[in-house]
Amino acid sequence: MSDNSHNLLYNKFELPESVKMSPVEGAAGGIDKVARFVADPLEKGMGHTLGSALRRALLIGLEAPAIVSFSMTGVLHEYMAVEGIIEDVTNIVLNLKGSLLKKYPLQDCEGGRASQKLRATISIDASDLAAAGGQKAITLGDLLQEGTFEAVNPEHVIFTVTRPMQLDVMLRVAFGRGYTPSERIVLEEREMNEIVLDAAFSPVVLVNYFVEDTRVGQDTDFDRLILQVETDGRVAPKEAVAFATQILSKHFSVFEKMDEKRIVFEEAISVEKENKDDILHKLVLGINEIELSVRSTNCLSNANIETIGELVIMPEPRLLQFRNFGKKSLCEIKNKLKEMKLELGMDLSQFGVGLDNVKEKMKWYAEKIRSSKNTKG
């Protein structure tokens, strides 16, 4: 347990209150397969930092189930044909690779992370063939007769039967990440004539991110991160982003343990959470009405900053541009504002105040407050 005396005070970081998710117009599959996520405001540079990290984690880190092997009555190896089935085994293998299954390996879920064998018996008689016009398509949904997996594309055709027959089919399903070629897949208790498949485990099809400029109050030097995620349906985009975030947090925690010193961040002050009248009474105060050193007061006076409102709307970097305004004066002013539950770079737009009109607005509000006091008196 670290001592609080080792904590380091850091200036606040602008963070989004939430991440906004929206559908992508014209995208097939709707929001369950394609979604756009917008996070703003972020500190300059954080848009690319987070976007790149999330993109890599989404593409390489997420797990999903996939069919890794199968066996079927009459099938001895991959390079053969089966009498009464249109597709040869090579094409059946390709169709199985296009099968999409979903199920999460929760700790309390039957089977957990171990591979599972799903067995099905397909019985096709003459009446089935007649009803299907002589060719009966066997779909992924037909093969999922047991187990706890759900087909994302149940109508996906695996093979087509042209004569009455009965087939026993076994599908082995496992969990993994990324893409694993068949020669790297290890099967426990492999059955005779069980054919191993290449497995595409990753449920994420495409990830793009963009970074735009955005503003906080009058300061435009912030990032907006736009992340667009497309999945194959085994995992929804919203889940994918949440899982990728947890994966990154897990890895970053290893580096966090290197030092016991903890960072304590100053919190951003939300005008919405404060009483507006109280805020206004503070904003109209003159700089000479608060206890600042002569040096800091003179620096503000030389910059033509006369009221607290004119001060707090000013971004920190802009203050440092004023002549003779140094880090010592900045630190003193920030501490004084913190005592007043104010800060630099505040958004005063709800009061109709911006950098271009702050001086006039402060005079107007000061007069309004004086008139209100006189009326009450």
From Swiss-Prot:
GO molecular function terms listed in the Swiss-Prot or TrEMBL record: DNA binding; DNA-directed RNA polymerase activity; protein dimerization activity
Catalysis performed (reactions): RNA(n) + a ribonucleoside 5'-triphosphate = RNA(n+1) + diphosphate
Annotated SMART domains: RPOLD
Covalent S-S links between cysteines: none
Pfam families hit by this protein: RNA_pol_A_bac, RNA_pol_A_CTD, RNA_pol_L
Keywords assigned by UniProt, alphabetized: DNA-directed RNA polymerase, Nucleotidyltransferase, Transcription, Transferase
SUPFAM superfamilies: C-terminal domain of RNA polymerase alpha subunit, Insert subdomain of RNA polymerase alpha subunit, RBP11-like subunits of RNA polymerase
Region called Alpha C-terminal domain (alpha-CTD), residue ranges: 276-377
An example Gene Ontology CC term for this record: cytoplasm
Region described as Alpha N-terminal domain (alpha-NTD): spans on this chain: 1-259
Gene3D superfamilies: 5' to 3' exonuclease, C-terminal subdomain, DNA-directed RNA polymerase, insert domain, RNA polymerase, RBP11-like subunit
UniProt-listed Enzyme Commission number(s): 2.7.7.6
Coiled coil: none
Family note: Belongs to the RNA polymerase alpha chain family.
Subunit description: Homodimer. The RNAP catalytic core consists of 2 alpha, 1 beta, 1 beta' and 1 omega subunit. When a sigma factor is associated with the core the holoenzyme is formed, which can initiate transcription.
Protein's job: DNA-dependent RNA polymerase catalyzes the transcription of DNA into RNA using the four ribonucleoside triphosphates as substrates.
Record text about domains: The N-terminal domain is essential for RNAP assembly and basal transcription, whereas the C-terminal domain is involved in interaction with transcriptional regulators and with upstream promoter elements.
Name of the featured protein: DNA-directed RNA polymerase subunit alpha
Organism the protein comes from: Chlamydia muridarum (strain MoPn / Nigg)
